[in-house]
């Protein structure tokens, strides 16, 4: 049975509330509103750039032409604008109408509503059937009570978070999926969300003032969130279209029923496609042949508060046509399911001692080599065979390579294979040198290089680059001290990167607070750049340091504290470390003031608090400098 939301309900509600709102404007607190003004009489068309909107203002002020000049007092006299279906593309100039309380611009061609931002007295805004997407410019309209944005193609309504005073909201016929922000609008008594793409209505659970709620033509399957809305007079829930995530087709298909009433009980399907059956809590089908989807229709009368509604719709389960691909590696078979008509994900290439993997073929000996970038899964099961070819013999080359610093202990051999009886030493003494590769060979799937006049080593031990590359280089906030100075030095850049020069032995900085500025990673290790006393020193291996402060040690808290009488001369810092370069001042200026502690950290056994006033961030100080009572 088809139901239809009657639009007259919306406008009856609006008319009644409009009278109340108009009285509220008249008897309000008289607060002044900031708005743009004109200082001399100005032609209408110079103020309102859109021709159609200029005509609307002309008619409103009973002027003969849009070339007529108007004063700010005349513009101040306009308290409402009704210009539906007027081909208006822009409301530029409306910022000069500070006393507008009601604005009806349905059926126009508006996209940008930024000029509305300063209409502080606006209580009623109707923009149905436009092309408005961005709602952020409404955030300061604190008197806005009723808002209608139906038929706009809106998908993001997070801009409504700043309008908790709204009492009626109409968002039907849009593309909304996420209504989380509506949980903040607890004063709503009327809400229309029909004909959207909403499935999760949990954010509505706390809107207990709702009297009229329109949710038809969405993707809703669970009504539990509505159970507490006892003030409802009108509720619409018909024509839900619920689409499950696609699953693989099976001859005997079982799909859990997820349609739930307000009390959490399952709603029994009324009609099930393809001769399916319902065995609570599952819907079952016997599908000997592939079909691309199955579905069931549900219907459930619902009563919430005074509202009676028919909760009905369809649940559709899309099905994927899948077949089995078998990967055969010399008789060892691995199987996987793949959807018909899609590309197959290439498996990891297999290895075979003394052979090179050639590719996956449709036959053991020959056939078609499968191209994972262009070939698609057919509508039947099939096997792909791993085909290998004998390894190529070694060949002459002429290359230049460098030892990767972290591979200095890798072996050098008489022949291209890892055998201790053939080992001639390590690469350590050849670091930082340009080495000539005169031959290459493959063995066991590994590429080997012969270093001229030295011997064979794996290609993975060598690099095209003389210097290490940094994997990342980022700013950090931390403090550390030297833990192990032996054998460690400080460099202008991370060691073995281009331009790195020796600065000093690390032992020179033993016992000093080292402020960590940056972190970088090379193949050797992770490095810290540090400063002492405000002076940048250089880079050091992080393994040589003991980091006693990092931001992850900070924990949020909420306390009230006061400066202890005898601690006014103590300092506060940018971070919880007593280091002069990050010192920000003393506590004297905050004596007898109420301070808020919003974060704490324990650094080397010492508790620190991050403090601020109600309006100003101060910094970190030792907890011992503060007390709980004034």
From Swiss-Prot:
Annotated GO MF terms: heparin binding; lipid binding
Region (B repeat region): 320-392
Region (GW repeat region, necessary and sufficient for cell surface attachment, interacts with host C1QBP and with heparin): 399-630
Keyword Repeat listed: yes
Entries under Pfam families matching the protein: Flg_new, GW, Internalin_N, LRR_4, LRR_adjacent
Knockout-associated phenotype: Deletion of inlB alone decreases host cell entry; the reduction varies from 99% to 37% depending on the cell line tested.
Record-linked SMART domains: LRR_SD22, LRR_TYP
Residue stretches of each LRR repeat: 75-97, 98-121, 123-141, 142-163, 164-187, 189-207, 208-231
Location in or out of the cell: Secreted; Cytoplasm; Cell membrane
LRRNT domain ranges (all copies): 31-76
Region named Ig-like region: 241-319
Any single GO CC term annotated in Swiss-Prot or TrEMBL for this entry: peptidoglycan-based cell wall
Domain of life (superkingdom): Bacteria
Domain LRRCT positions: 241-330
UniProt signal peptide: 1-30
Keywords, comma-separated and alphabetical: Cell membrane, Cytoplasm, Heparin-binding, Leucine-rich repeat, Lipid-binding, Membrane, Repeat, Secreted, Signal, Virulence
Record carries keyword Repeat: yes
Domain GW: 393-467, 472-550, 553-630
Domain notes: The N-terminus (36-79) resembles a truncated EF hand, the LRR region (80-240) has a curved form, while residues 241-321 form an Ig-like region; the whole region forms a curved tube. The LRR domain alone (31-241) binds mammalian MET and stimulates its Tyr-phosphorylation; the LRR plus Ig-like region (36-321) are required for receptor dimerization; adding the B-repeat allows the protein to scatter host cell colonies, and the GW domains, especially GW2 and GW3, potentiate MET activation.
Job description of the protein: Mediates the entry of L.monocytogenes into normally non-phagocytic mammalian host cells. Its host receptor is hepatocyte growth factor receptor (HGF receptor, a tyrosine kinase, MET) which is tyrosine-phosphorylated in response to InlB. Downstream targets MAPK1/MAPK3 (Erk1/2) and AKT are phosphorylated in response to InlB, which also causes cell colony scattering. Complement component 1 Q subcomponent-binding protein (gC1q-R, C1QBP) has been suggested to also act an InlB receptor, but this is less certain.
Family, as annotated: Belongs to the internalin family.
Quaternary organization: Interacts via its LRR repeats plus the Ig-like region with the extracellular portion (residues 25-741) of its receptor MET; MET can bind HGF, its endogenous ligand, and InlB simultaneously. Probably forms a dimer upon interaction with host MET, which subsequently allows dimerization of the host MET and subsequent host signaling; dimerization probably occurs via the convex surface of InlB. Prevention of dimerization does not block interaction with MET but prevents downstream action.
NCBIfam families hit by this protein: GW_glycos_SH3 (NF033202), List_Bact_rpt (TIGR02543)
Name of the protein described by the UniProt record: Internalin B
Highest classification ranks of the organism: Bacteria, Bacillati, Bacillota, Bacilli, Bacillales
Protein encoded by which gene: inlB
